[in-house]
Amino acid sequence: MAVDEMQLAASMQMSNQMSNSQRMSFAIHEILGIQGNAYLSHGYCPQGTFLSNQPNFMDIGSCGVSGFDRQLCGTDSIGNAPAPLMYRMPISTSEVITSEPQTHVSSSSILSSATTSNSSGGGSSGGGGKASKRKKRRHRTIFTQYQIDELEKAFQDSHYPDIYAREVLAGKTELQEDRIQVWFQNRRAKWRKTEKTWGKSTIMAEYGLYGAMVRHSLPLPETITKSAEAADPQQSAAPWLLGMHKKSMEAAAHLESVEKCDMSDSDDDDRPVTPPVQRQVKNEYKPRIIEHVQQQAPQHQSSLNFDTSLVVSSSLSQLHFQDSQMIPNNNASLKLYHDYNNPM
């Protein structure tokens, strides 16, 4: 029996030594040869590390040691821990389980507070969006073509109209004076932009080269007009300008031909045109008119004969009176003639 007890004690001692050697062989400070940590030399974690106020007591940073020594805070170190530390540890797993819902409640409360803060922030941001939407929109005026034409005419006369000119325009266009002022500001900005793009030639900016030449009645260069006779307009120096020139010439020729046709039609319209119905009526009345004239002819003839007899008698009497006056004169002239022929 004594031998058995001795063998049992020896085996237990060997198992304890083996367990101690196995425990120490797994220690990181034994593997790395670190002996400076006072807590690791005793084989337990400092007091209060497992009952920290962190949400999760198994967190990496809950132990008082460094992060890679957290494996040392296991069952072995807890078993070797002194009595004060054991008193601070939870007695059963139920206490640990009961402590976990509190952490969940706290986290849920945190989430609820975060959601309420987000909702309040969202409401404030939404209120800001509504406030921005409630801002007064700028009044935009839609101009008619007549109003634009009148404003353009005034802009050609003056880029900076005075208050009197703006009031006159307001009466013509039925616009407010401030709207007219804003339109002129925008139009001046547009004009400056086009002037900056095209230079000082605002005519070029508004109408282009061909429009400027037509507006000022400038002749096209000979290089372009000579190339107009060519079959291919692309061979000219400015094919687009030549194309516009040809189109304008064709339009002018067509307009001239139309005007000539209108003039000839107007001349024909001036002549009286008898419709065929009137011609038939005239042809029907012609024999009746001839008969009426023939019936009235003797009366007219008698009256004409009476008138002619009176005229003839009066003319004969006048001739006789003249002859009676001319006879003495003829004798006197004959007497003078004889005296001239017979001188003394």
Swiss-Prot record:
Tissue expression notes: Expressed in several neurons including AIY, CEPDL, RID, ALA, RMED, AIN, AVJ and CAN neurons.
Domain of life according to the entry: Eukaryota
DNA-binding region(s), residue ranges: 136-195
Residues annotated as transmembrane: none
Segments for region (Disordered): 97-139, 260-279
Annotated localization: Nucleus
Predominant location category: nucleus
Compositionally biased intervals (Low complexity): 106-119
InterPro entries listed in its UniProt record: CVC (IPR023339), HD (IPR001356), Homeobox_CS (IPR017970), Homeodomain-like_sf (IPR009057), VSX_homeobox_regulators (IPR052294)
Task performed by this protein: Transcription factor. Binds to a sequence motif, 5'-TTATTGGCTTCGTTAA-3', which may be involved in AIY interneuron function, in the regulatory elements of target genes; binding is more efficient, in vitro, together with LIM/homeobox protein ttx-3. Required for larval development and for cell fate specification and migration of CAN neurons. Required for generation, or placement, and differentiation of the ALA neuron, and may play a role in ALA axon migration. Involved in development and function of the AIY interneurons, acting by regulating expression of LIM/homeobox protein ttx-3.
Compositional bias (Gly residues): 120-130
Disulfide cross-links: none
Keywords: Developmental protein, DNA-binding, Homeobox, Neurogenesis, Nucleus, Transcription, Transcription regulation
Name of the protein this chain belongs to: Homeobox protein ceh-10
Organism: Caenorhabditis elegans
Gene3D superfamilies to which the protein is assigned, alphabetical: Homeodomain-like
SUPFAM superfamilies: Homeodomain-like
UniProt keyword annotation of Transcription present: yes
Family (UniProt): Belongs to the paired homeobox family.
Xref: PROSITE patterns: CVC (PS51496), HOMEOBOX_1 (PS00027), HOMEOBOX_2 (PS50071)
Gene: ceh-10
UniProt note: phenotype after gene disruption: RNAi-mediated knockdown causes severe defects in the ALA neuron in young adults, and when RNAi is begun embryonically, some individuals lack a detectable ALA neuron.
